[in-house]
Structures are given as C-alpha cells and as structure tokens.
From Swiss-Prot:
Binding site for heme b: 187, 214
Domain remarks: Forms a 10-stranded antiparallel beta-barrel structure able to accommodate a hydrophobic ligand in its interior. In fact, this fold hosts the heme group, which is located in a wide surface cleft.
Species: Mycobacterium sp. (strain KMS)
Keywords: Heme, Iron, Isomerase, Metal-binding
Positions occupied by motif GXWXGXG: 71-77
Pathway involvement of the protein, from the record: Nitrogen metabolism
Cofactor: heme b
Stated role: Heme-binding protein able to scavenge peroxynitrite and to protect free L-tyrosine against peroxynitrite-mediated nitration, by acting as a peroxynitrite isomerase that converts peroxynitrite to nitrate. Therefore, this protein likely plays a role in peroxynitrite sensing and in the detoxification of reactive nitrogen and oxygen species (RNS and ROS, respectively). Is able to bind nitric oxide (NO) in vitro, but may act as a sensor of peroxynitrite levels in vivo.
InterPro entries: Calycin, Nb(III)_bact/plant, Nitrobindin, THAP4-like_heme-bd
Protein name: Peroxynitrite isomerase
Keyword Iron recorded: yes
Enzyme kind, highest EC tier: isomerase
EC numbers, comma separated: 5.99.-.-
Cofactor: record remark: Binds 1 heme b group per subunit, that coordinates a highly solvent-exposed Fe(III) atom.
C-alpha cells in the first residue's frame, strides 16, 4: 500500500473539470441514483431517515457544509493491517432525519486477490454535527464525528471543512472496551473527487507513535 494521498491528488479534483462537465456528469448519474433511497419502516410517527436529498424531510441548514456527503456510496479500497496489505469492498450510508446531525454507517468486507468476497471486515456507526471548536470556542464551528466501531472501541473526532467538498478530522478521544482492538488515534480526509465519487484516506498512530497509512478508498454514488 502506498503512502496516502489527499483525495484531490489520489483521484483527481472534481474542480479539474469544467462546471458544465460536472453538471453533465451529475445529471447522467442522477438518471440511475435519483430514484433510489434507503429502506425504512413507514409506520413510525417520526420523520424517516433519508439518504436522498430529493426525498423525505427538509435538510437542516446547520449541516449545509456537509451536504455533499449525503447518499449511499459503494466501492473498493486498500488497507494495511498487522498481517500486511489487503483489499476491501465498502458501503457507506450517510442519511438525515431533518435533525442537526448526519447518521453515518460504514460496512466493509475483505476481498480475495481476484476481487471476490472473502470475509466480513470493519464496521462503524455514528453521527456528524457542528459544535463550538473545542480548541478555540471563539472561532468558527468545528465538525464533531462520534463513532462506535464493531472492533470494540468508541472514537471522537474533531475537524473542519477544507473547502466546499473536502473535510479533515483528527481523533480527539478514544475509549476501548475490555474485548476491544488496541488502536491508536487517526487522521481522516474525505473529499468529493472527479466524477462525483467520495474518496478518503485514513492514517493511524502506530506503536512508534507516528501516523502511518491505514485505509484508503474511492466510492461511487449509489443513492441520491
């Protein structure tokens, strides 16, 4: 696995194409993705979660800087673990219910060398929102990402939008259960890249205390 690059470098910036091209690409994708949404129970009295901004309850204005993330994303990536590098498939669902937070669910599965399903991989669920910057409350709002990992730990990130289509976050706190995996903090960078895909890289602190490549992926929009 090569050293992580920023999504703009790894997959090409969406801004490298003309505005007309970007609009045309989005319109073409929407022919397939615009009619899709996540399954929900329709007999609950509260607003249903939606991963399609064309459907469901109105989007909360407090989250406009995170709006491009909403959708269902699917694709493949590369990881580095204690036993070497590996490939994985992944689905990320980013939905909302009109509240001042985004719902986040990421599921991954290991792939064989030929690209076939091998076994269950990492899974995490959590919430994105904006809060007062813990480092400087007088400054602009910070992104807060709270995640629970199936590997047995809870992680709190803070960060900021880098521009209208990329977001950077760093671990602020981490709590591990007795059965949980021993991990260090992380740095994540997400970005919407050329073609409208969602790309990200994650580095994690290793035993020597330095950030090392851990995960990277490029995911195509499936819903929204």
């Amino acid at each position: 696995m090569t050293a992580p690059q920023e999504p703009e470098d790894a997959a090409g910036s969406i801004f490298s194409t003309s505005g007309d091209r970007a609009v045309a690409d989005a319109a073409e994708r929407a022919k397939v993705t615009a009619s899709r949404n996540i399954p929900v129970f329709d007999d609950l009295p509260l607003p249903a979660d939606t991963a399609n901004l064309r459907k469901g309850v109105d989007f909360n204005d407090a989250l406009l800087a995170l709006l491009p993330l909403v959708g269902v994303w699917r694709g493949e990536g590369e990881g580095r673990g204690p036993h070497g590098d590996y490939r994985f498939g992944q689905q990320i669902v980013v939905s909302h219910d009109g509240g001042d937070y985004l719902n986040w669910e990421a599921r991954s599965w290991r792939l064989t060398e030929s690209g076939e399903y091998d076994r269950v991989g990492l899974r995490e669920t959590g919430f994105w929102r904006f809060v007062s910057d813990p480092a400087d409350p007088s400054e602009s709002q910070a992104i807060e990402l709270l995640l629970a990992h199936s590997a047995g730990y809870i992680e709190l990130f803070y960060g900021h939008p880098r521009n209208q289509s990329s977001w950077e976050l760093v671990t602020d706190a981490l709590a591990r259960s007795k059965s949980g995996m021993l991990v260090g903090g992380a740095k994540r960078l997400y970005g919407i890249v050329e073609g409208g895909d969602l790309a990200y890289v994650e580095e994690r602190v290793d035993a020597d205390g330095g950030l090392v490549p851990h995960l990277s992926a490029r995911l195509a929009r499936y819903v929204g």
